[in-house]
């Protein structure tokens, strides 16, 4: 019995762990965790990664949040080691300017945290602000591919860089700088920003992010054919240009844009669908009421018929008893006479 209970508890824990989202929001930062992954620090430093801090922390959550709270430098990667190599030093902070500068490898006793700037989801819902971070599902798919390829190349050395070179897009389109993003507008601005967002690991300058937010996009930019945002390899970034302009910027009427629905193609049918949604429910209620009433009426009729039959039978037996008694009296009188 104890073994069965233990198995049930383990299964419940695995289900709860699967339901938990790997991405959380904390202090204007999106923190995405990748269990079983760590960073090859030496190789990453050769490719341009910057070592920031290596210290002791209580939990992996605090390690990732402390990387988010760093204001002196831009910290976008944190690695927490459950089994520290050195004296209780288990938290590593690194800044990776590009995707190619971070070389990852599997590690059973480590958790990698990707920290990117973002907007509070409550503000996105109640203030109708367009999302700046991309879909996390595409990022998780890239990471699943990375884990599979890395697991295949664990036994041999020198295979992982080749896999990364085939898997990661080229860095030629990443030549656009943060200042170009803040200065350009229109269609040319959209093409540069989307390609740069797709290849950068995170944004390294907060001032340029404010410049991007201050630029008001035009209608031509919103409907331009080249405005296709490429999902980054890691989590959300803070410089992605909004695909749907806000209501305060372009002054669009309500029937054309309905941001609470989440899809532009469903706006024309959202108001007409409400009566149809309530009709089946009301019909079901009426049908249940009619069926219940018919059942009650039939039950009452059966009860009345049953009681009437019982009363008739009792009256018949009483009449027969009276007749037999009167016949017996007559016979006795005749015999006595």
UniProtKB/Swiss-Prot annotation:
Q: Where are the transmembrane segments?
A: 279-299
May I ask which residue range the UniProt record assigns to the signal sequence? Answer: 1-18
Query: Which residues face the membrane's Cytoplasmic side?
Result: 300-337
Glycosylated residues (UniProt): 114, 227, 251
Q: Topology relative to the membrane, per the entry?
A: Single-pass type I membrane protein
| Annotated PROSITE patterns | MANSC
> Subcellular location, in the record's words?
Membrane
Occurrences of domain MANSC (ranges) = 33-113
Source domain of life is: Eukaryota
Q: Which UniProt keywords apply?
A: Glycoprotein, Membrane, Signal, Transmembrane, Transmembrane helix
Query: Quick check: keyword Signal in the entry?
Result: yes
Q: Which InterPro entries match?
A: MANSC_dom (IPR013980), MANSC_N (IPR011106)
Where is it mainly found?
membrane
The answer to whether the entry has keyword Disulfide bond is no
Query: Any ranges marked Extracellular in the topology annotation, and which?
Result: 19-278
Query: Compositional bias (Polar residues) at which positions?
Result: 216-230, 239-260
Concerning Pfam families, the annotation shows: MANEC (PF07502)
Question: Could you tell me which residues belong to the region Disordered?
Answer: 216-277, 314-337
Q: Name one GO cellular component term.
A: membrane
UniProt-recorded name of the protein:
MANSC domain-containing protein 4
């Amino acid at each position: 019995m104890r073994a069965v209970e233990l198995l049930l508890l383990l299964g419940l824990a695995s289900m709860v762990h699967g339901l938990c989202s790997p991405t959380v929001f904390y202090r204007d930062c999106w923190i995405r965790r990748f269990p079983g992954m760590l960073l090859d620090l030496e190789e990453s430093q050769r490719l341009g990664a910057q070592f920031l801090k290596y210290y002791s922390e209580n939990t992996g959550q605090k390690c990732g949040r402390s990387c988010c709270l760093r204001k002196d430098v831009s910290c976008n990667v944190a690695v927490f080691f459950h089994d520290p190599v050195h004296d209780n030093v288990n938290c590593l902070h690194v800044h990776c300017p590009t995707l190619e500068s971070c070389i990852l490898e599997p590690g059973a006793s480590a958790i990698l945290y990707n920290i990117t700037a973002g907007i509070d989801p409550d503000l996105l819902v109640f203030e109708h602000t367009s999302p700046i971070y991309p879909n996390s599902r595409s990022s998780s798919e890239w990471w699943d591919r990375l884990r599979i390829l890395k697991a295949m190349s664990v036994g041999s050395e020198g295979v992982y860089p080749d896999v990364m070179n085939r898997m990661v897009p080229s860095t030629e389109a990443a030549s656009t700088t943060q200042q170009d993003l803040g200065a350009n507008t229109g269609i040319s601005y959209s093409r540069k920003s989307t390609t740069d967002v797709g290849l950068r690991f995170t944004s390294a300058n907060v001032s340029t992010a404010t410049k991007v937010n201050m630029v008001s996009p035009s209608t031509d930019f919103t409907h331009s054919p080249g405005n296709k945002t490429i999902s980054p390899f890691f989590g959300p970034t803070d410089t992605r240009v909004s695909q749907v302009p806000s209501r305060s910027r372009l002054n669009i009427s309500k029937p054309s844009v309905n941001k609470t629905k989440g899809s532009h193609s469903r706006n024309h049918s959202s108001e007409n669908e409400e009566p149809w949604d309530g009709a089946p429910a009301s019909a079901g209620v009426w049908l249940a009421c009619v069926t219940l009433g018919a059942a009650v009426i039939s039950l009452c009729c059966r009860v009345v018929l049953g009681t009437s039959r019982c009363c008739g039978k009792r009256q018949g037996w009483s009449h027969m008893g009276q007749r037999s008694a009167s016949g017996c009296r007559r016979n006795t009188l005749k015999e006595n006479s």
